[in-house]
Swiss-Prot record:
InterPro entries: Aldolase_TIM (IPR013785), TAL/FSA (IPR001585), Transaldolase_1 (IPR004730), Transaldolase_AS (IPR018225)
Function according to Swiss-Prot or TrEMBL: Transaldolase is important for the balance of metabolites in the pentose-phosphate pathway.
Family as reported in the entry's similarity comment: Belongs to the transaldolase family. Type 1 subfamily.
Active site positions, chain numbering: 126 (schiff-base intermediate with substrate)
Any GO BP: carbohydrate metabolic process
NCBIfam families with a match to the protein in the record: talAB (TIGR00874)
UniProt organism field: Burkholderia mallei (strain ATCC 23344)
PROSITE patterns reported in the protein's UniProt record: TRANSALDOLASE_1, TRANSALDOLASE_2
Primary localisation category: cytoplasm
Disulfide bonds: none
Any one Pfam family match given in the protein's UniProt record, by short name: TAL_FSA
Localization in the cell: Cytoplasm
Name of this protein: Transaldolase
Keyword Cytoplasm among record annotations: yes
Gene name of the encoded protein: tal
Length: 317
């Protein structure tokens, strides 16, 4: 029997969302994504501790920030040995509201990869989908540095990223689901509110339809999944980045997976283009309580994990 994972791959590029690169080979993903939380999780495992220790030892006299950048590249280069496509490496979330420093960090990461023998076409620079992050992506894209826009929770963020020419966006399914489920509390009914009605699934479907309708070339990669049903409801999306745990569940399942998203259907949709300038972007984002709260929370969480990683490095020096 064909597995659900193999069926999904007929419609969608499957990406592994992990820093635990030893798990990659069995699922044969095209690309891989990382973030500060995933790297922090990985270096706490015995299998990856030597990478952290070697990076700290090799750059003993350098700043913690310098060492973290080298650690990210160390993980990225190991991941690229196991996949045919691209790896996403994230800019420090504490730069989410600083356009110039985000640009500088993106350039620096690419230089480090190139010094390690990795071409820039195999790397995506992850930036938060703030106004400042989107402006940084606009500059980097013009320089041939491809960007993956993360912490994306709304159509206005997606529209702004497309207008800026970002290579790829990562709308977060699970975190949207979490917010609406918490809001409903005891009234949440998974049978009624999940599946095709899942707010996170609907958000990605809306963004995908908007992009294909207006002919944007920016890739849509659904991210942050809680269940396999969220994944299969988005079969046909350009890419889906999936944790090893959910990849395993899809691998173990033989449930039928049908295409749910189609560019042809999207082109026939009746839609209006979203107006994008700084003031309208900020107002529309502010008007969306879920997107505002989850964006702020995501930046805080990634920043906190960056601090934890810094403390781990300090303890080894």
């Amino acid at each position: 029997m064909t597995t659900a994972l193999d069926q999904l791959k007929q419609y969608t590029t499957v990406v592994a969302d992990t820093g635990d690169f030893q798990q990659l080979a069995q699922y044969k993903p095209q690309d891989a994504t990382t973030n500060p939380s995933l790297i922090l999780k990985a270096v706490q495992k015995d299998a990856y501790r030597p990478i952290l220790e070697k990076t700290v030892r090799d750059h003993a006299g350098e700043s913690v920030g310098f060492i973290i950048d080298r650690l990210l590249i160390a993980f990225g280069t190991e991941i690229l040995k196991l996949i045919p496509g691209r790896v996403s490496t994230e800019v420090d979330a504490r730069l989410s509201f600083d356009t110039q420093r985000s640009i500088d960090k993106g350039r620096e990461i690419i230089k480090l990869y190139e010094a390690a023998g990795v071409g820039r076409e195999r790397v995506l620079i992850k930036l938060a989908s703030t106004w400042e992050g989107i402006r940084a992506a606009e500059v980097l894209q013009r320089e041939g540095i491809r960007c993956n826009m993360t912490l994306l929770f709304s159509l206005v963020q997606a529209a702004a990223c497309a207008e800026a020419g970002a290579q790829l966006i990562s709308p977060f399914v699970g975190r949207i689901y979490d917010w609406y489920r918490k809001q409903k509390g005891a009234d949440w009914d998974e049978a009624q509110d999940g599946g095709a009605n899942d707010p996170g699934v609907q958000s990605v479907r809306r963004i995908y339809t908007y992009y294909k309708h207006f002919g944007y070339r920016t890739e849509v990669m659904g991210a942050s999944f809680r269940t396999t049903s969220q994944i299969t409801e988005l079969a046909g999306c350009d890419l889906l980045t999936i944790s090893p745990e959910l990849l395993q569940k899809l691998h173990d399942s033989t449930e039928a997976v049908a295409r749910k998203l189609s560019p042809d259907e999207a082109r026939d949709a009746r839609l209006e283009r979203v107006a994008i300038d700084e003031s309208s972007f900020r107002f529309q984002l502010n008007d969306d309580a879920m997107a505002t709260e989850k964006l702020a929370e995501g930046i805080r969480l990634f920043s906190a994990d960056a601090v934890k990683l810094e403390k781990m490095i300090e303890a080894l020096r």
